[in-house]
Amino acid sequence: MAVSFLQSLFSVFRKKSSPQEPATTTAGGPAKRTKLTVGELQEFAPEWIVIGLGNPGAKYADTRHNIGYWPIDRLVERYEAQWLPVEGQKAHAALITVEETPVLLLRSTTYMNNSGEAVGPLASALSLPAERIIVCHDELDIAAGQVRIKDKGGEGGHNGLRSMTAELGTQHYVRVRMGIGRPPKGTSVIDFVLSPFEEADIDAENGWMENTLRDSVDSVTLIVNNGTDIARNDIHTRKH
């Protein structure tokens, strides 16, 4: 079985409870940054916020409910960014530029049910409307291996989305919906979403998660560069 990004990610997350942060010092060099301020985010002037929904901590790292973290972690890796806590906020942030567009990636330091608390205050401070917020999350009503883009709509019982709507005061934010399918007969939804994926699902050669990860990352970059209509036409017509 080939080792995939997902498997590497799992091995890292099982050892720590928060996104990787830089050391405070480097040998023979100046101290590295250990945090960001809201003022620095305002200077960066992001045109988009992208948040992945999940629960913090190694206990939940490889569960279905945390699938929304994976595309933003891949983006951090791709753009050689780093996670830093935001002073006075319930979030870790990473700053990337997609082509020429500044983008703020976020991870909530709260649990899933309070995910919106990471976004609402920052969106307000940055004067970004909800339409410029992309939420990556797990979706029971979409088959495992499929990714769908949605401009707005209800929360479908998803507590993370409920928190987003409550904090933003609107349902008009963009969703990258990552299908995990429905639980098998006899398994409750809670047990299903809080249980880990099977090794076969994340196998680099035969599993479906690599396709899901690629499509969700592409969804984000396509939305940022071209808008939701073009992104949807591309992602929704892909065959795996």
UniProtKB/Swiss-Prot annotation:
Species, as recorded:
Corynebacterium jeikeium (strain K411)
Gene that this sequence comes from? pth2
Q: What is this protein called?
A: Peptidyl-tRNA hydrolase 2
Catalyzed reaction equations: an N-acyl-L-alpha-aminoacyl-tRNA + H2O = an N-acyl-L-amino acid + a tRNA + H(+)
PANTHER family annotated for this entry? PEPTIDYL-TRNA HYDROLASE
Q: Does the keyword Hydrolase apply?
A: yes
Name the positions where tRNA binds.
60, 111, 113, 159
- Chief location: cytoplasm
Origin, by domain of life?
A: Bacteria
Q: What keywords are assigned to this protein?
A: Cytoplasm, Hydrolase, RNA-binding, tRNA-binding
